[in-house]
Design a protein with these regions (language model features):
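Short alpha-helix carrying the canonical HExxH Zn2+-binding catalytic motif
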Residues: 103-108
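Short active-site segment of divalent metal-dependent hydrolases/proteases
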Residues: 112-113, 186
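Gly/Ser/Thr-rich helix-start
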Residues: 113, 118, 315
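Histidine-centered, transition-metal-coordinating active-site segments
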Residues: 1-77, 81, 85-91, 98-99, ...
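A glycine- and small-aliphatic-rich helix-loop capping segment at beta-alpha/alpha-beta transitions
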Residues: 117-128
């Protein structure tokens, strides 16, 4: 028996019968024969493929809510991804589900995010003329764009969880549902931290009715939400919150949209960011020869608009600014904010 087979046997001994077992995966887009020397389950291999990908490394230079904030402690897509992973791992472990699958989904769920957060999604949607959704782009990254067009060839359950971590369609696995919830828990709580750091909020601004249910600081809120999911899901046999906590979380998200996500401080640079990406899109549409050479073969398969979207979506915030400066700002000039 190989090490991998022993790990798969251990999963059957210790995990909840409702868990997604590695040896029951629906497989990969392209068949890969088992290798006797591989000591990892399919989901463990998927984690490693994602973490070693170029798209994953770029997450550290893509901002979350505040565009290019001054300071070292604001969240990026990378820190958000790690927080989602830790929350999801805690919940899956407590419920006896597959931590490896949850971690793989969490690590890959935001790989397709544009520079400048959701402002980038809006910009590309307007330019391209089609809805640009980061969850669909994340799947495109792992299926196609990574490894020079070959993709990472991830397991079905990981790909499903990445695609369905947001939007109307829900994941097929409980682990995918947990990552979807963990994403909500992570971003609403760390965005409060960043808003407090930016001077937009204080903890006292959060409505008392919400704080009395979820807690009065970052640690209390996350602990309440995680523990409530664990207790409620154990009894219900699915991933859910109690009605009281569900309502409080929904109200907290509404509060954050009103006070933070639509706040002039958070949104002040969005107009500039959208205009920057739109001008880059228009430039590459007019000058496809200026695209990097590794994107040229894609033009004949996907068309110019789709290829330009892929290129811009893969940019980090700083790279987008640098390309804009290189193309549109005369050498030696400085842009004043």
């Amino acid at each position: 028996m190989t090490v991998r087979e022993e790990l798969e046997r251990q999963e059957h001994r210790r995990l909840n019968p409702k868990a997604a077992f590695a040896d029951r995966s629906k497989g990969r887009p392209r068949f890969e024969p088992d290798r006797e020397e591989d000591v990892r389950t399919c989901y463990q291999r998927d984690i490693d493929r994602i973490v070693h990908s170029k798209a994953f490394r770029r997450l550290m230079h893509k901002t979350q809510v505040f565009l290019q904030p001054e300071g070292d402690h604001y969240r990026t897509r990378m820190t958000h991804t790690l927080e989602v992973s830790r929350i999801a791992s805690t919940i899956t472990r407590a419920l006896g589900l597959n931590e490896d699958l949850a971690e793989a989904i969490a690590m890959g769920h935001d790989l397709g995010h544009t520079p400048f957060g959701h402002a980038g999604e809006v910009a590309l949607s307007e330019c391209w003329g089609h809805p640009f959704r980061h969850n669909e782009q994340s799947l495109r990254v792992v299926d196609y764009l990574e490894k020079d067009g070959h993709g990472l060839n991830l397991s079905y359950e990981v790909r499903d969880g990445i695609l369905c971590h947001t939007g109307d369609k829900y994941p097929d696995t409980l682990e995918g549902l947990i990552v979807r919830r963990s994403d909500q828990i992570a971003y609403v709580n760390h965005d409060i931290d960043d808003a407090i750091r930016a001077g937009i909020l204080t903890n006292e601004d959060i409505p008392r009715a919400i704080s009395d249910v979820l807690g009065h600081d970052h640690s209390q809120r996350i602990n309440t939400l995680v523990c409530d999911i664990i207790r409620t899901s154990t009894k219900a046999g699915t991933v859910c919150l109690t009605p009281q906590v569900e309502t409080a979380l929904k109200d907290l998200r509404s509060f954050m949209f009103e006070r933070v996500y639509r706040n002039p401080v958070a949104k002040g640079e969005e107009t500039k960011a959208r205009a920057m990406l739109q001008r880059l899109y228009e430039y590459y549409i007019a000058h496809p020869e200026a695209l990097p050479e590794d994107f040229h073969p894609q033009l004949s398969f996907d068309g110019l608009g789709r290829t330009v979207c892929d290129y811009i979506a893969g940019m980090t915030d700083n790279y987008a600014v640098d390309k804009y400066t290189e193309i549109f700002i005369p050498s030696g000039w400085q842009v004043r904010g």
